[in-house]
């Protein structure tokens, strides 16, 4: 199919369905510059391997195979993949411009430096406070199969229109840390993971692009939680919240275990807002949005942080 396509460097076959393929001749043979092949759930490497003509599937091609977390082991153990010695990694598509997101996958990783891309830190949700409207994040050092997480990505200086591919998360699987998991480990967790796309549960909370968890309408039938991601369920009052439960209309922000906020709300000892300041003279050089990011061109009518206070820009 792609025999001797010398100019190919990356190939997206995430929507390719191999179920009806009856013959496959030297699929990626002599694609010498091909570095990455992205495969979807309906791309069966083992199925193609059973076709006699697939014997040269990866001849003279050293591309890394990126597959969905659910099909990782099937792809890794494919006879042709083993024979060719292809590297295999799971990948998850994400919103490339969001600083925070959620992740829940059926395979594990020890997250050794240099073994993962698309995020820089991983957290578990360990508590929620109804009165403060916050959830607490505790840093995780590895990916445990089936456990839901919040990830952070350092995006300062990223050129989203350039060659930087920030639209996927990928990592090396640690076989020793990956048990056989067929369902998320949601028992006792405020953050609930899902391996498949699902309609968001009414009354739950979804992490949105502003870095906060927003409530889902009780009668929701359209808003979805994506595959290999997670949502916040505060229906139980056993952890935080008190006897009165949680306010379903409230937006919940994230704070780290040490009390530091992920957003703009830095609090002084006297309870006043410190805001985000230039460390040289404690004066802001520019406007900041509500996530603490510098804004080069403030928009009229939008809310920003100036001198530690929220203001509406009216110029």
Question: Where do the language-model regions lie?
Answer:
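Consensus positions within tandem repeat domains that build extended binding/scaffold surfaces
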Residues: 1-3, 22-29, 52-58
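Extracellular/surface-exposed low-complexity segments
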Residues: 59-91
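Short linear interaction motifs
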Residues: 127-137
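C-terminal outer-membrane/trafficking sorting elements
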Residues: 126-127, 260-315
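Structural signature of tandem-repeat unit edges
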Residues: 6-22, 31-50, 62-73
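A short, polar beta-strand/turn micro-motif
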Residues: 84-116, 137-212, 216-264
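Structural motif
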Residues: 40-42, 66-72, 106-107, 154, ...
């Amino acid at each position: 199919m792609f025999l001797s396509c010398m100019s190919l460097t990356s190939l997206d076959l995430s929507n390719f369905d191999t179920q009806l393929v009856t013959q496959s001749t030297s699929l990626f043979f002599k694609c010498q510059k091909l570095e990455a092949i992205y495969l979807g759930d309906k791309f069966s490497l083992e199925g193609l391997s059973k076709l006699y003509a697939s014997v040269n599937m990866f001849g003279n091609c050293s591309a890394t195979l990126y597959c969905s977390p659910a099909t990782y082991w099937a792809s890794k153990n494919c006879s042709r993949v083993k024979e060719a010695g292809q590297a295999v990694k799971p990948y998850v598509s994400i919103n490339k411009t969001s600083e925070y997101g959620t992740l829940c996958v059926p395979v594990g990783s020890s997250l050794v430096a240099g073994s993962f891309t698309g995020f820089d830190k991983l957290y578990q949700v360990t508590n929620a406070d109804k009165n403060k409207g916050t959830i607490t994040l505790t840093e995780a050092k590895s990916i445990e199969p089936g456990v839901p997480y919040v990830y952070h990505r350092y995006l300062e200086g990223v050129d989203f229109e350039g060659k930087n591919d920030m639209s996927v998360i990928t990592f090396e699987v640690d076989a020793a840390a990956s048990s056989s998991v067929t369902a998320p480990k949601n028992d006792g967790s405020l953050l609930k993971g899902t391996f498949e796309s699902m309609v968001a549960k009414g009354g739950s909370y979804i992490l949105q692009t502003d870095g906060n968890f927003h409530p889902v309408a009780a009668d929701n039938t359209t808003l979805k939680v994506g595959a290999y991601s997670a949502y916040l369920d505060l229906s139980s009052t056993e952890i935080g919240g008190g006897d009165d439960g949680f306010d379903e209309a409230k937006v919940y922000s994230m704070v780290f275990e040490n009390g530091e906020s992920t957003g703009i709300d830095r609090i002084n000892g006297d309870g006043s807002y410190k805001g985000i300041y230039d460390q040289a003279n404690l004066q802001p050089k520019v406007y900041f949005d509500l996530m603490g990011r510098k804004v080069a061109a403030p928009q009229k009518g939008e809310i920003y942080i100036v001198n530690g206070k929220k203001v509406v820009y009216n110029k």
